Amino acid sequence: MADTGTPEDILPGRFRDWFSARGWRPRAHQLELTQAALAGDSALLIAPTGGGKTLAGFLASLIELSAAPRSRPALHTLYISPLKALAVDVQRNLMQPAEEIGLDLRIESRTGDTPAAARQRQRKSPPDILLTTPEQLALFIASANAASFFADLRCVIIDEIHAIAPGKRGDLLALGLASLAEWAPDCRFIGLSATVREPGELANWLDLRPGCAAPRTIRAAGGARADLSILVSRERI
């Protein structure tokens, strides 16, 4: 019998309904990355600004968390941003679709501005999704009980990876990723970028675990269509 399914079939019904309610359709690169991530594969997504790459990075995590809610607090997805302001912004933007889809998730950020009380609570009761920076991750990894905190980690998302990987910040983060790979061997690594000069090198930097296939490189066909209008004044300005 011929396969009559569509690429969108990898999305559960309530996810498809969420896209449809907004007059959207998931883009090909979003579905391709979601499929790779659900298979446990690491990947590098190259998509222009407005291409929906941030949502693409999180879709598989949201699907997994919707299908199998955790019986105890445990970190599922770690998002790493070059800027603390971006981490906080993505946290806010991610909470809206999660709530609209009907997911009961804890999505929190951990930056230099996070109060000490919130940091302590996160250690004792990890959120489902944590958004942070390379420096905050390095501090966390160097702390006691870090291995147990990250043991259940399933996904690491590195946003604007082209801005982090080169230089000292990239070296610092690479050490952190090596620790995460050791503590959570089933974890996948997702890199997001709008522009990459050497995608092969960056993909290899993303996941260097021996015996693992090289991360897949996924390229978006194009960004969102611009919605432009011209305002013409009848009077002289």
Please report, for each region that a protein language model flagged, where it lies by residue:
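Conserved pre-motif I regulatory segment
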Residues: 2-46
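Walker A/P-loop NTP-binding motif
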Residues: 35-39, 43, 54-72, 178-181
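Conserved SF1/SF2 helicase motif Ia
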Residues: 48-51, 63-90, 103, 182-186
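Conserved Walker A/P-loop ATP-binding site and its immediately adjacent core
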Residues: 54-55, 75-96, 135-138, 194-200
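Conserved helix-turn-beta segment of the N-terminal RecA-like "Helicase ATP-binding" lobe
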Residues: 86-111, 204-211
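Conserved motor-coupling elements within RecA-like helicase/translocase cores
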Residues: 113-131
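SF2 helicase catalytic motif II
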Residues: 130, 134-138, 142-189
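Conserved interdomain linker/interface between the two RecA-like ATPase lobes of SF2 helicase motors
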Residues: 178, 186-237
